[in-house]
Amino acid sequence: MASNNVAQFAAELKMPAGVLLEQLQAAGVQKASEDDALSEADKARLLDHLRKSHGATDGDKRKITLTRKHTSEIKQSDATGKARTIQVEVRKKRTFVKRDDVAEGAEQGQAQVAEADDDAELKRREEEARREAELLEKQAQELRERQERLEREEAERRAREEAAEAERRRAEEEAAAKRAAAAAVEAQQAAAQQAAEAQQETAGAQSAQDEARAAAERAAQREAAKKAEDAAREAADKTRAEQEEIRKRREAAEAEARAIREMMNTPRKAVVKAVEPPKPVEPPKPVEAKGTLHKPAKPAGAGAARPAVKKPAGAAPATTQAPAGAGDRNKKPGGGKGGWQDDAAKRRGIKTRGDSSGGVDRGWRGGPKGRGRHQDSASTFQAPTEPIVREVHVPETVSVADLAHKMSIKASEVIKVMMKMGQMVTINQVLDQETAMIVVEELGHRAVAAKLDDPEALLVEGEATTDAEQLPRPPVVTVMGHVDHGKTSLLDHIRRAKVAAGEAGGITQHIGAYHVETPRGVITFLDTPGHEAFTAMRARGAKATDIVVLVVAADDGVMPQTKEAIAHAKAGGVPIVVAINKIDKPEANPDRVKQELVAEGVVPEEYGGDSPFVPVSAKTGVGIDDLLENVLLQAEVLELKAPIEAPAKGIVIEAKLDKGKGPVATILVQSGTLNRGDVVLAGSAYGRVRAMLDENGKPTKEAGPSIPVEIQGLSEVPGAGEEVIVLPDERKAREIALFRQGKFRDVKLAKQQAAKLESMLEQMGEGEVQNLPLIIKADVQGSQEALVQSLLKLSTDEVRVQIVHSAVGGISENDVNLATASKAVIIGFNTRADAQARKLAESNGIDIRYYNIIYDAVDEVKAAMSGMLAPEKREVITGMVEVRQVFKVPKIGTVAGCMVTDGIVKRSSSVRVLRNNVVIFTGELESLKRFKDDVKEVKQGFECGMSVKNFNDVIEGDQFEVFEVTEVARTL
């Protein structure tokens, strides 16, 4: 958009128009206002002026910055054959400054040298990446060779096992053959012995020779069998040892292969810059790789042969370059860590079976079940071996997590100690000081009871140091009186706005703050409700006020809330100006009003008192000027002063939760100046003032003493009547607010009336007490507390009002869920439920009642409580009967012949037996007959027969008093 005037050009430059006018005048361009036209020549003059003022002689550009980015890719494949791409990105930034012609040649030479250096750097880095890829390829080739070697060893092992098995079978066959041969020899010997016995005489010498030879053969056979068994046993032991050795080697090789695969799959760190080009190192031979094959705890297997790569900034390496002998320098089995391996791989390490590495290079979990934890790092830091005894300052209350943090241990350790002490706790559970100190001592530290750090003391110190000039301020006037006496209408005439028409039912239910400018000065008015329910609001109004205007209707006189307003004013020591309203009515009687006020201790000036009485009419405007004159006169007498150039202090008049704006508070500034952007503290709420509106809804940047404003930006809805303080920083405000929240947490929990064991026992002792649970949501804080107090006053010994929850804002789903759990009725005072809450309430059958007049809410709750009362039982005497004769009837009992002397007797009635006018029995009629016929009722003057249930001691002359019990509904 073209800028044709000063205002548009300032908006385009995003600067205040006043500053732009000053710069134009300094440049010699005469512009008087924001609407003056602005030409291109004027803009050029302004630009030249600004350049000269900032030291620029001409508009030529003498510096230019060039940025260049070069990206290259390197492809490689890992051990699994999966292709991976490594991207190398080089960024260059060059700034050229125009100098004299003499230095241009040298500058060009330096630029060419720098570009040549960059090209050499790029080539060197590409060479490093290529060498890394070659190294990875060599490792993959080495892995394949190891796998082939393992396969060959496995085949050799199987062949040896088969040969051993064949040898064992052959030995068994030989042993069996030898045993068979021995048996045959023994049979031959037996036969020969028999033959020898037959030919003993002729062949004695021959048989002796044969016997000696057989014994020698048997000895030889036993020796051979023993040797064969020993050989078979040795072969089996050797085979088992070889199998165990092969199994161990296979497991070690598999663990190493798994570690190499993890190493290959781990993302590498990008190469940034090396200190000097690495020297090519030959990879280790497979035969010499004993450390990696037999000690599987080594993570990489070729870490000593890898070139060092510089880590990113902030991670200082142990050495800038790892030569071939770097692994021997640390004297650790298995060599050192690879320089290119990232921190995650270092932390993981390699998990192996057993502890074959001697527990040296095992990472964090080297041994079984985490034994021998330590980290093999190249840094020189050594963890302390002795326990550190700390001095722990324990506050009055501390959570388990905070206590563990103070001792620099995990919260689980504190929970373990508490469990050993027999107490089950969670990480967020709060411990008292005594328990926390016992836990600290149990863990071997020194516990010191910390002093209570009360941040409230900072506020007192801040007040003591504040010293500002006291300047006059406008008076704060509170309009008080009985309901419907015309307070708001009177203020409405003063403000010339229709406020009373906007209140539901024509009665004020909110406290309003307005300031009015008169010819003699500014007056701030606080309009308070007159209904009896709003006692707390009137008390807050009297607390913040300087002068009270007591409005009394001339036709109504002094009423209960008028007396209460007088009591509030006297308690606060505030002067009273009496406005006798409605003098335009024919039935007005100002003299009677004066007499009634004198009886209450408010004496008019004409009677020698100190309270001016002004007759006014809010309808016609009569006496309004005199009323303002008297108010300002009282203010002059009081000499009201307050510091202006100081941090603001005030009081929360009203607070509410707006759906679009969040927490909104109406604040009356009592001293200092409140600016937009200040950090305020109101009770347990804090925040920065995001927006500030006056009573008419217009934005304002600041508010001085006695000025009411509406602020936004608080963390929560503050309580009405809370003191508002401006603090220098938000951190201190948050600290004090959290301290106050923790300090009053017990009070807040007590208000929720949780079902504790003690309260349950009390209710059991009280008997059956009906409860009416309610959830109250109001538009502002004052209305909410007024409604709560009014409903709580309705409680009786039989029916009790239970406020489950009360808050400011609309009715939400959480409120409906709470009502479902507590079986409560939701009351919305000038608020509504959103769509989700209404739908949930309909599905759960929750009753939501909306009110905008406090009368209606109180009356309906009162009616509901009346319906919960037990009905009252009343006795109504319906007749009197005289016994004339008594009959004894078998199987029935005594039957009295009676005469109805008064009223009527019904069969369903109850009866009292009177003898000599003394009640001797109370019961029910069992039968009612007339001439042997059962009848429902007998009227006066007729005879009848009657029998009383469970009573036979009837004599002549007794009287029966017949009555009925009726239930009557009770009301509160």
Swiss-Prot record:
Residues 481-488 are annotated as: G1. GTP binds at residues 481-488, 527-531, 581-584. Residues 581-584 are annotated as: G4. Residues 472-641 form the tr-type G domain. One of its GO terms (molecular function) is GTP binding. One of the essential components for the initiation of protein synthesis. Protects formylmethionyl-tRNA from spontaneous hydrolysis and promotes its binding to the 30S ribosomal subunits. Also involved in the hydrolysis of GTP during the formation of the 70S ribosomal complex. This is Translation initiation factor IF-2. It comes from Burkholderia ambifaria (strain MC40-6). The lineage of its organism: Bacteria, Pseudomonadati, Pseudomonadota, Betaproteobacteria, Burkholderiales. The gene is infB.
